[in-house]
Amino acid sequence: MLQIQHIKKEYRTGTLVQKALDDVSLNLRDNEFVAILGPSGSGKTTLLNIIGGLDRYDSGDLIINGISTKKYKDRDWDSYRNHTIGFVFQSYNLIPHQTVLANVELALTISGVSKEVRRKKAIAALDKVGLGKQLHKRPNQMSGGQMQRVAIARALVNDPEILLADEPTGALDSDTSIQVMDLLQEVAKERLVVMVTHNPELAELYANRIVTLRDGVICSDTNPFEPDSETLLPPKHKNMGKSSMSFLTALSLSFNNLRTKKARTLLTSFAGSIGIIGIALILALSSGVNEYIQNMEEETLSEYPLQIQSTG
């Protein structure tokens, strides 16, 4: 269970203070589809970022499974994001030169999962979103809706407890939006899904709870949740492990990036070589000119020696 207690957040630019969230409190069930509605600047995305650990609150508390995050360090937030949260954004954020399967596997690669296990999990996640037969396509060979489904598969491959979606249908047409929303609704049967949207029709049709924000304050909540003593379980701290990528894995990904962009790599190398050679020639020419001038000065002075005579 996720509990947001009296969260406040301000953004400061010089003397200007923008209050994004003002004493926001919200209790979220383990399995529900929550839609956060509100106009631009109401604090929707800020709230989503705080839930996902992408932003820090100024005061209040975010309680995860009974554990306060007030004393969380950077490594705790990193582990929380990588193991508990799945992110789906309006922009798909897929790596264009990688296949669909490789894009989904990347989330597990960062978590240090072995190749065999991550391949199996990635295929299962893509099957779940209906893309099991398009594993080896690249993002530029897919439609917007398909790319968003790849992004959802990537978010689900780590089996997160919470899925956060920021305007997941913002760049899609109405028919494709319905497909994505159907998928998110299905996902919400097994975990908590929190979606930010400007579309009240989609929210009312698919979400089982709508929270409306305005000027950083919750105006309405269609299905509020107040945990009682029976609902509140003893605090449990989940050992989520450390997320890391080995040096060899990072080197392999970099090499694949260079290999798939051969023309750009060659042109960049050629341009860099010309630049280095040009600098070397300028330095050599400058050194040669200075040496020539010095030799000329010495020869001139030797031909016309200066004579100093004393008078008096």
Model-derived segments and spans:
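Alpha-helical transmembrane segments
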Residues: 264, 277-307
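Catalytic Walker B motif of ABC-type/P-loop ATPase nucleotide-binding domains
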Residues: 163-166
